[in-house]
Amino acid sequence: MTAQFEHVSVLMDETIDALAIKPDGIYMDGTFGRGGHSGQILARLGSEGRLQAIDQDPQAIKSAEKFADDPRFAIAHTRFSNLYGVAEQNDLIGKVDGILLDIGVSSPQLDDALRGFSFMKDGPLDMRMDPTTGRSAAQWLAEAELDDITHVIKKLGEEKFGKRIAHKVLEVREHTPITTTKQLADLVDEAVPVKDKFKHPATRTFQAIRIYINSELEEIQTALQSAIKVLKPGGRLVVISFHSLEDRIVKQFIRKQSRGETLPRGLPLTDAQINQNLTLKAVGKAIKPSAAEVERNPRSRSSVLRIAQRLG
């Protein structure tokens, strides 16, 4: 692996502290990436400890070969939303001491032009976390209706010029297939009338299409629900997210599972409402990277770490 494609795991110390690793514990890293967090977990496990990793990216699976000789380690090539399935196959339901989810695109994925995630590097417009399955971004843009493109860019990218961009996509694709990241970045640049001097005009559009192509928000929701069933009482759920849509889902999930539904005041309550089945306890407040970490690794700037503990 070249230095260009190396990945610096964010909030490393904070994440390891949050997992409260026991030497003989069982842990799951739902987003192995290049193994930064997994390596630190393994370093703290004793001979009886166990780490089950997951990743859908074939390059991540290849990277995991460095741990192939460690009997405490195993990895499954699948989406992290399949957390429950992996745990079930390995007889881990209700036995796991800690689950880590480091959500979003990794530095190697961004830095490799051939993956099609970055508007800063020209390459094929792919954006799939697992390029062996599903539709690429180019295939979707070639077929999608105006309203669908508008909806994705506005909702998942929080881009106020979503409709303008969608119209531009349809205008361009009538005479030229949109197959590269540069083509998409250039047409977004043309479509956006007001530029943010601190942010590339294509930032939100690329984010939106990537999230849509990989069903990222649905992935998070499914994985969070699965984590409750997989964790043992006292087990930790540790989630790192990188933008507001992801963090909102995590925050609201932990809040609901730790506080229950908001009940109406002044009305008689049913037994079910009174005895809500709370499954998690929030641990501390959201953690953000230090100024020193942001200086070392600017991509960590938007990261947020949230911690919850499984109730018994």
Swiss-Prot record:
GO terms for cellular component: cytoplasm. One of its GO terms (biological process) is rRNA base methylation. Its EC number is 2.1.1.199. It catalyses: cytidine(1402) in 16S rRNA + S-adenosyl-L-methionine = N(4)-methylcytidine(1402) in 16S rRNA + S-adenosyl-L-homocysteine + H(+). SUPFAM superfamilies: Putative methyltransferase TM0872, insert domain, S-adenosyl-L-methionine-dependent methyltransferases. The keyword RNA-binding does not apply. Signal peptide: none annotated. It is found in: Cytoplasm. InterPro entries: RsmH (IPR002903), SAM-dep_MeTrfase_MraW_recog (IPR023397), SAM-dependent_MTases_sf (IPR029063). This is Ribosomal RNA small subunit methyltransferase H. It comes from Pseudoalteromonas translucida (strain TAC 125). The lineage of its organism: Bacteria, Pseudomonadati, Pseudomonadota, Gammaproteobacteria, Alteromonadales.
